[in-house]
């Protein structure tokens, strides 16, 4: 059984070659190319030659007038050739670096510069041999499937034939690509070509698909002057008349790109100036200076503007704290009702600003200096000249004397015997003669106690009982002294009543008064009467923040101080 193939019509049909070239170009660029090829592979020439292939029938499965299916053994050694064009990378170091990770390469500079060279490749002298399954149908076209790799050899001629390394490399790469082409792409190409030849519907469908592509790429473009803007202006911003717009055309010498809408120009200007948003309609934020708006000189001005409002706030804060300090130091205004509230105001003043600490220290030094200025040498006339009334007035009017005894106690010179128990917090040691004047403020309490004892009818011999005590030169504390003074304090509390409790701070000054035998008794009684009158007036007034809370504590226990050296 024999078949006659008419090979010459395939060679003479120009449309067949054009279509075959397009299909081969798409097939060669479909698969991933090697890194050395940096451009598309284009089939520029295709010729099947004048020698047909040899076919040997091995099996016929179906045979009819319009269909055929069989298995053939094909062998081809003809004069067909194929010409390709592409661009390759001539610098192998660049190709090597592109295929390697950056951290594993030395990253050269000039040595890795890419160098692309155009390349033309001609494939000829094909030798094919293999088993082919051929299925023919007028409705479905021709289907050719290779059961094995049909390519045995071919000849590759290129621009780099003079370089053996490049020639051998191209030979290997092209053979590998052609083997994939024969096994996968060539059957699909043959099937599409057969459908175009024998199936009119498929040909009409392809023509419809290719027609929009041609019309889209050809023909005149749209005229932008067909629908001019509503408010046209030129490049200088001058408005244009309708007659001027009508005279414009794409072929005229007038610059058509100068015809812009004023609204669009404003929007573009706003977008260029803002540099903060991609939307033209984003609302701006009030009292905000954007970084893109300011130059280095303007940034300094902006910083000055932003920091200026802070200065008045700081000055007002200082003024407020200063007024609070003066309010606390005033002798005519009572600041609070308890010592704890006064302490709270004092520490809140420290927390408000840094200057409050300095103000309080300055005031404390001034008060100490006033007391020192009132001190006189210890004589009869000088002792009488020290006005207990003025000292008491300062104590009653200044609420900040609550913390005054503590620094004075800390300034005590080296004691002979330290306190023996934690209860010593309520006891104050005897103060030497050079320090007694600094605590002249509690002295009126001593006279007040004496006056109260006189008014309630207490024994007049009580002060002489305390005169022998300072004669004791022994500095060690004694239990008999503590028991004696405790009994004396109980008698005083019974005589004066529960509302006349006196702290332990008056005991040393009681001893001081008993030891001062040269003081005029008449002057002391007159001063004591005046102070008692002031005490009665003080009871009618609201209690101060420090004095009332301190003298009115019912749970305050009084203990005699330890016997220190004179």
Curated annotation (Swiss-Prot):
Chain's role: Component of the ERMES/MDM complex, which serves as a molecular tether to connect the endoplasmic reticulum (ER) and mitochondria. Components of this complex are involved in the control of mitochondrial shape and protein biogenesis, and function in nonvesicular lipid trafficking between the ER and mitochondria. Mdm34 is required for the interaction of the ER-resident membrane protein mmm1 and the outer mitochondrial membrane-resident beta-barrel protein mdm10.
Keywords, comma-separated and alphabetical: Lipid transport, Lipid-binding, Membrane, Mitochondrion, Mitochondrion outer membrane, Transmembrane, Transmembrane beta strand, Transport
Composition bias type Basic residues, residue spans: 358-370
Organism encoding this protein: Aspergillus oryzae (strain ATCC 42149 / RIB 40)
GO BP field: mitochondrial genome maintenance; mitochondrion-endoplasmic reticulum membrane tethering; phospholipid transport
Main location: mitochondrion
Renumbered residue ranges of the record's region Disordered: 212-237, 349-401, 432-518, 539-566
Coiled coil segments of this chain: none
Entry protein name: Mitochondrial distribution and morphology protein 34
Family: Belongs to the MDM34 family.
UniProt subunit comment: Component of the ER-mitochondria encounter structure (ERMES) or MDM complex, composed of mmm1, mdm10, mdm12 and mdm34.
């Amino acid at each position: 059984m024999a078949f006659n193939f008419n090979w010459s019509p395939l060679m003479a049909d120009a449309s067949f070659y054009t279509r075959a070239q397009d299909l081969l170009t798409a097939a060669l660029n479909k698969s991933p190319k090697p890194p050395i090829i940096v451009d598309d592979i284009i089939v520029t020439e295709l010729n099947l030659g004048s020698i047909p292939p040899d076919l040997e029938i091995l099996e016929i499965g179906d045979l009819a007038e319009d269909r055929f299916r069989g298995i053939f053994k094909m062998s081809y050694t003809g004069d067909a050739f194929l010409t390709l064009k592409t661009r390759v990378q001539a610098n192998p170091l660049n190709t090597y670096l592109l295929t390697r990770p950056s951290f594993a390469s030395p990253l050269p500079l000039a040595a890795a510069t890419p160098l692309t060279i155009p390349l033309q490749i001609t494939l000829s002298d094909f030798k094919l041999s293999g088993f082919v399954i051929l299925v023919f149908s007028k409705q479905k076209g021709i289907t050719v499937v290779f059961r094995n790799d049909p390519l045995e050899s071919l000849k590759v001629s290129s621009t780099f034939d003079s370089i053996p390394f490049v020639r051998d490399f191209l030979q290997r790469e092209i053979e590998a690509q052609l083997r994939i082409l024969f096994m996968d792409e060539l059957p699909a190409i043959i099937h599409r070509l057969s459908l175009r030849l024998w199936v009119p519907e498929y040909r009409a469908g392809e023509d419809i698909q290719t027609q929009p592509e041609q019309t889209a790429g050809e023909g005149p473009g749209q005229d932008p002057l067909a629908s001019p803007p509503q408010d046209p202006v030129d490049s200088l911003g001058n408005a244009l008349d309708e007659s001027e717009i009508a005279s414009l055309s794409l072929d005229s010498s007038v610059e058509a790109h100068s015809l812009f809408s004023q609204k669009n120009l404003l929007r573009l200007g706003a977008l260029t100036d803002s540099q903060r948003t991609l939307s033209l309609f984003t609302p701006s934020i009030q009292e905000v200076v954007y970084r893109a708006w300011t130059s280095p000189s303007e940034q300094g001005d902006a910083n000055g503007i932003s920091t200026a409002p802070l200065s008045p706030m700081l000055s007002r804060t200082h003024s407020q704290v200063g007024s609070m300090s003066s309010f606390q130091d005033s002798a005519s205004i009572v600041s609070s009702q308890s010592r704890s509230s006064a302490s709270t105001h004092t520490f809140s003043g420290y927390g408000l600003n840094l200057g409050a600490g300095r103000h309080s220290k300055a005031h404390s030094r001034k008060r100490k200096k006033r007391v020192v200025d009132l001190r006189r040498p210890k004589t009869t006339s000088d002792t009488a000249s020290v006005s207990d009334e003025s000292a008491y007035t300062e104590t009653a009017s200044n609420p900040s004397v609550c913390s005054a005894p503590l620094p004075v106690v800390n300034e005590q010179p080296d004691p002979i015997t330290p306190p023996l128990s934690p209860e010593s917090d309520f006891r104050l040691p005897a103060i030497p003669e050079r320090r007694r004047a600094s605590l002249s403020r509690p002295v009126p309490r001593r006279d007040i106690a004496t006056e109260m004892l006189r008014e309630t009818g207490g024994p007049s011999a009580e002060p002489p009982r305390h005169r022998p005590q300072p004669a004791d030169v022994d500095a060690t504390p004694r239990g008999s002294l503590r028991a004696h003074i405790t009994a004396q304090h109980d008698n005083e509390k019974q005589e004066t009543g529960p509302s006349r409790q006196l702290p332990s701070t008056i005991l040393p000054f009681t001893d001081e008064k008993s030891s001062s035998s040269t003081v005029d008794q008449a002057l002391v009684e007159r001063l004591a009467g005046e102070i008692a009158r002031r005490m009665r007036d003080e009871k009618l007034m609201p209690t101060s923040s420090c004095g009332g809370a301190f003298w009115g504590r019912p749970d305050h226990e009084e203990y005699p101080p330890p016997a220190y050296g004179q």
